[in-house]
Amino acid sequence: MASGALGVGERINGVNLGNWLVLERWMKPGIFAASGEADEIWLHRATKSAELEALLTRHRDTYITEADFRNIAAHGCNLVRIPVPYFVFGDVPGHPGCTEYLDRAFDSAERAGLKILIDLHTVPGSQNGFDNGGLTGVVRWHHSPRAVAYALNVLACLARRYRDHAALFGIEAVSYTHLRAH
């Protein structure tokens, strides 16, 4: 893909980089094996801080690399969707952030001629009750003005941080919502 924005009418050929910054048990069950937990939030709660930091660092350093961005572009893609958790900035105790990986992704994508669609994949209290929402069996986010405000703030911070980066395509507000009473 040529550098610059995707144009009106230009076909988007993209891939999702799931399970990198938001863990999804069905994609890589081994990362959950020691704890037996069903989702990322409970994995974080069940794992000691130093162990969790080491586990996430090992996973994030190796699961998606600069070579993957080059390979994706070489296969004709022009966009990657990157799911991020609501604790992306590392400001939620017990949940290590991942902006350094997202920063690297933006630089790798730009070098490879790719655009990025950031996807806020989890929100406090979960938006769908599935592992991809971070918290299995719970859908409370939309009942909490505080949680909604927090998610909106994360989106605003992501927009401020990446708005001028040449690789930014857009930001997906909240992924896979299922707003039902719980």
Please report, for each region that a protein language model flagged, where it lies by residue:
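Catalytic metal-binding/acid-base residues of hydrolase active sites
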Residues: 21, 121, 174
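Aromatic-lined carbohydrate-binding/catalytic grooves of carbohydrate-active enzymes
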Residues: 75-96
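Aromatic-lined carbohydrate-binding surfaces of glycoside hydrolases
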Residues: 84-91, 116-135
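N-terminal carbohydrate-binding accessory modules
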Residues: 1-77
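Conserved small/polar residues in nucleotide/adenosyl-binding loops
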Residues: 177-182
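An active-site-proximal structural segment forming one wall of the substrate-binding cleft
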Residues: 60, 69-74, 96-121, 133-170
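Aromatic- and acidic-residue-enriched segments that line the glycan-binding/catalytic groove
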Residues: 25-37, 96, 126-142
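Hydrophobic faces of well-ordered beta-strands that scaffold small-molecule active sites
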Residues: 13-15, 80-82, 116-118, 171
